[in-house]
Amino acid sequence: MANPLYQKHIISINDLSRDDLNLVLATAAKLKANPQPELLKHKVIASCFFEASTRTRLSFETSMHRLGASVVGFSDSANTSLGKKGETLADTISVISTYVDAIVMRHPQEGAARLATEFSGNVPVLNAGDGANQHPTQTLLDLFTIQETQGRLDNLNIAMVGDLKYGRTVHSLTQALAKFDGNRFYFIAPDALAMPQYILDMLDEKGIAWSLHSAIEEVMAEVDILYMTRVQKERLDPSEYANVKAQFVLRASDLNGARENMKVLHPLPRIDEITTDVDKTPHAWYFQQAGNGIFARQALLALVLNSDLAL
């Protein structure tokens, strides 16, 4: 049976319906249980990272290799024609799209990934993060991890902590979890880094419960998922960063009273917001979460590049 994601651009988590999300997650579970090293054997995929990345780039490229695809691309735009000669993004994408079957792209400018789709022809573009906007594949691995650990994606209590203003992962994850029934959100952030109003308005329109809090301990006993984020130094002026970086820090002692199966997630990199003593607790699940990126991204690549995927 033909799949609905074949040759589809994946720019925002809103490009995926609830059924699409379930399809990706089911495919990820199958690939985790049964690797397919030749599934993309004759495909060439561009890995175009105009912004620094460790986990996302390596996870995507590992996913490509483990499915048998050939990988071309760059991890620093400074050494490309765009960086050195002033070539436009439109021209860069127009050329790259003639070489490959799909483009995975990260860019510091919000909206850059959507712009790329206007110049990629029939070649699908997968957004690996555009500024503070969207990071849909991080959301897919987050959903996969939540489903694995909690056994469901509905009727969950989810707390999000830290930089909720610039943290694109929490924007995408909230929008995705809002597609499922009965979820409740707790947002814990300084006023300067509060969740954007458009996200809160979206939750209100859907009748989804949410609340604002000033400390992690206010909600610890209530939540199934505690999603920590770092304060993004690169998106703040130095004085603002100094004021807020240490405001929300999770320590092992803070986990007293947490639900037995509560999991602490983090998109990484971690700086100071989770102390290392948390790593030794059964609640810490951020490294397993990062590992799940392989399977979530494999699933998305497999679906986007196969019209009839049977695993």
Curated annotation (Swiss-Prot):
Which positions does UniProt annotate for L-aspartate binding? 85, 168, 230
Q: What is its EC number?
A: 2.1.3.2
Entries under PROSITE patterns matching the protein: CARBAMOYLTRANSFERASE
A Pfam family in this protein?
A: OTCace
GO BP terms in the entry: 'de novo' pyrimidine nucleobase biosynthetic process; 'de novo' UMP biosynthetic process; amino acid metabolic process
Taxonomy, superkingdom: Bacteria
- Alphabetized Gene3D superfamilies for the sequence: Aspartate/ornithine carbamoyltransferase (3.40.50.1370)
Top-level EC class: transferase
Q: What does the entry list under GO cellular component?
A: cytosol
Question: Catalysed reaction per UniProt?
Answer: carbamoyl phosphate + L-aspartate = N-carbamoyl-L-aspartate + phosphate + H(+)
| UniProt: carbamoyl phosphate binding residues | 55-56, 106, 135, 138, 268-269
* Pathway linked to the protein: Pyrimidine metabolism; UMP biosynthesis via de novo pathway; (S)-dihydroorotate from bicarbonate: step 2/3
The alphabetized UniProt keywords are: Pyrimidine biosynthesis, Transferase
Tell me, in a sentence or two, what this protein's role is: Catalyzes the condensation of carbamoyl phosphate and aspartate to form carbamoyl aspartate and inorganic phosphate, the committed step in the de novo pyrimidine nucleotide biosynthesis pathway.
Record family assignment: Belongs to the aspartate/ornithine carbamoyltransferase superfamily. ATCase family.
Q: What is this protein called?
A: Aspartate carbamoyltransferase catalytic subunit
Lineage here is: Bacteria, Pseudomonadati, Pseudomonadota, Gammaproteobacteria, Enterobacterales
